[in-house]
Regions:
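Bacterial N-terminal signal peptides
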Residues: 6-15
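Serine-esterase "nucleophile elbow" of acetyl-processing enzymes
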Residues: 25-93, 110-116
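Active-site segments of SGNH/GDSL-like serine hydrolases
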Residues: 121-127, 146-177
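Catalytic His-Asp segment of secreted/periplasmic serine-dependent ester chemistry enzymes
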Residues: 164-241
């Protein structure tokens, strides 16, 4: 059970006739991105070509879902393509599990230069929490990476680390969640609070994040990633409307 939970942790526009699918994943409150928070994304959509860089740990690769088509980046691409007809969506995945801040900085610099994304979506904190990294050091590395992303001209959406009950019993997750929220507030970038979303889904039995049956684990992972994609796609499209 703990292995599965740790895998989870580490692991349109109306004017143009664009629409967003109706929500099927319950949320305690709607994730809203301010209208002026995604200027590069809006400009890219206007050019009918949007490149998104998804940055995170093992969860970005979505191994528990057993299929790349079920990962959250793949599901986000599919949902945005449906919501934004006529716009080419290029989804770049940079998974950096268990990497140091220095390694992340080097890989991020190279990927920003190579792909020139309009939007970066970064789920930070899982590896740092697993290692028990010093919080000030973690906040510093996140702040540095945020500055690099913003200096490149890309928009940014941060995400807090993921939650699972069995992981929360053995790893102190809340300080790293708070650190990402703090970094987002300091940089004035939107933050999707995955930790609270997943805790809500667990507490309301919407998702069994500690499922043990293999078939159930796969189904839970696929639903989890699709829910994240649903919430992100709606927020992005609403923001550039």
């Amino acid at each position: 059970m703990r292995k599965w939970a740790i895998l989870l942790l580490l692991a349109g526009l109306h004017g143009f006739g664009w629409t967003v699918q109706a929500a099927s994943c319950p949320t305690p409150e709607e994730f809203v991105v301010a209208a002026d928070a995604l200027p590069a994304t809006k400009a890219a959509i206007g050019r009918r070509a949007l490149t998104i860089l998804t940055l995170g740990g093992a969860a970005t690769l979505g191994a528990p879902a057993q299929g790349t088509e079920y990962t959250y980046p793949s599901r986000l691409k599919a949902r945005l393509a449906e919501a934004l007809p006529g716009v080419t969506i290029n989804m770049v995945v940079l998974a950096v599990p268990r990497q140091s801040g220095v390694d992340l900085d080097l890989k991020l610099s190279a990927e920003l230069a190579a792909t020139n994304p309009a939007l970066v979506i970064w789920g930070a904190g899982a590896s740092a929490a697993g290692r028990g990294d010093d919080l000030d050091t973690f906040i510093g590395s996140v702040t540095q990476a945020v500055g690099k992303i913003q200096s490149s001209g890309a928009d940014l959406i941060l995400m807090t680390l993921q939650y699972a009950p069995s992981v929360a019993r053995v790893i102190d997750l809340p300080p790293y969640r708070s650190a990402v929220l703090q970094a987002g507030e300091m940089a004035s970038v939107p933050v999707l609070d995955r930790y609270e979303l997943m805790r809500f889904w667990s507490d309301t039995d919407f998702l069994d994040l500690d499922a043990t049956a293999p078939e159930t684990r796969v189904l839970v992972a696929r639903k989890l990633y699709d829910c994240m994609a649903e919430i992100l796609s709606k927020a992005i499209v609403d923001a550039v409307h």
